Amino acid sequence: MKLTLGFRRAVASCAVLLSLASAAASAKVFSPTVYTLSNGLEVVVVEDHLAPVVTQMVWYKVGAADEQQGHSGIAHFLEHLMFKGTPTVGPGEFSKIVARNGGEDNAFTFYDYTAYFQTIKADRLELIMKLEADRMQNLALTDDQVYPERDVIVEERRQRIENSPAARLGESMRYVLLTNSPYGRPAIGWLPEMQQLTTADAIAWYKTWYAPNNAILIVVGDVEPEAVKALAEKYYGPIPAHPVPPRIRPQIMMLPEGEHPLPEPERRVTLRDPAIHQPEFARYYVAPNYSAKTRKQALALEVFDEIFGTGSTSRLYQALVVKTKVATAAGSSYDDTALDPGPYDIFASPAPGKDIAEVESGVDAVIAALVKDGVTAQEVADAKTRLESQAILARDSLSGPAHSIGEALTTGQTIDDIENWPEDIASVTQTDVNDAMRGVFGAKAAYATGWLLPAKGTKAPMDAVAAANTTIAPSGAFR
């Protein structure tokens, strides 16, 4: 559960880091006030009286991974349509009202959740609660609103995926690695399925999943918990709860009719594109997350990620960029907050004159050494110090607490998990880290390798080229 900092902040010295870590390990993270309304809406309030500002977020426990065959993209589509108005607030008026009152708003969709947020002067909290509660139950959709917006999301996919070689590589790597998981399809959706979404699909999704008993209201800022509770009961309290289906994830990723996944055991993807001038290497491993059964491993992998691929002192950066100089950049990213196992990402950019195969060999060498010898006790101690400091830094914005809490609660964690995170990180041992690392990167590792190359020039291994050429994907998904 990486704490969201809002903005990356540099810590000036080791002395500051040590003092922050000491405080973080002995204190709670956000100290929220938590209650549940009679209709099942969870409410979380975090006080921050530094400025007369407030952030409201409403998180729904549904995302792209909950979509069914033939309807990929519907979660993100409805997110767009939530701004189309209600009987009392016209299309597009929601954001205009927020802006006229000096605030800003937006929304986002990922695999396990959909979230909506506003940041505004604290004395306007009642206004944004009224607006958000209104669209939780009164969204009004017509064909005239829905189908032009479908064109918008299709164009968004073209801009973000089709026109981005790096995004297409990432999409195809997820696909070949996570074929048996809904995380293997793009959160934005497969293009052919997006183009077939209807008004009825959007309304059905809204009526199925958008309910107070499937939502979390988070308020962070210059507020008093009792005042927030009174407003929540006034505006959200009257919304009736309704049964929400269990989040049953398919065991086999569903693709559009006639499409087939890449044959096993090949899990390599090479993408060539005329727009690419700088080759890129990527590797995705399947890793556990903060679910109840794998929380201990996730904590240990967070510590490992600090050692392995975070920053210029990491094992990966030092080996590839500083020592062998085969790369100009190298790092990793661990997606630990999710309902199901997901990718642990490694990336590197070859240095001028260096072949991408040298980069891959360098990455493999670093991983092999770690699997063989493990990390050191000092590396673990230093990594925990850096991580624990985030517990204090995460309080320095309104969006940080709201995002960290919402992401955690929509993916099966509890308030206690969030508040005890510093202590849990402090309890991670060298053995824990090495065991978790070997579980992901050892002999039974599941991974996909990706090469992003210019249209001409650098040659890829034949098995990678063959794998890429045999990939059959939905039209527009990978190419």
Residue locations for each model-derived region?
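Short pre-active-site segment immediately N-terminal to the catalytic Zn-binding motif
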Residues: 63-71
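N-terminal secretory signal peptides that target proteins for export/translocation
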Residues: 1-6
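Active-site SXXK
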Residues: 72-86
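A common structural junction motif
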Residues: 133-141, 235-243, 364-375
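Bacterial N-terminal signal peptides
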Residues: 11-22
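Solvent-exposed, non-transmembrane alpha-helical starts
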Residues: 69, 126-129, 163, 230, ...
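Non-catalytic beta-strand/loop surface segments
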Residues: 25-64, 88-123, 160-214, 238-291, ...
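Non-catalytic, conformational "gating/processing" segments within enzyme and secreted inhibitor domains
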Residues: 150, 203-235, 445-446
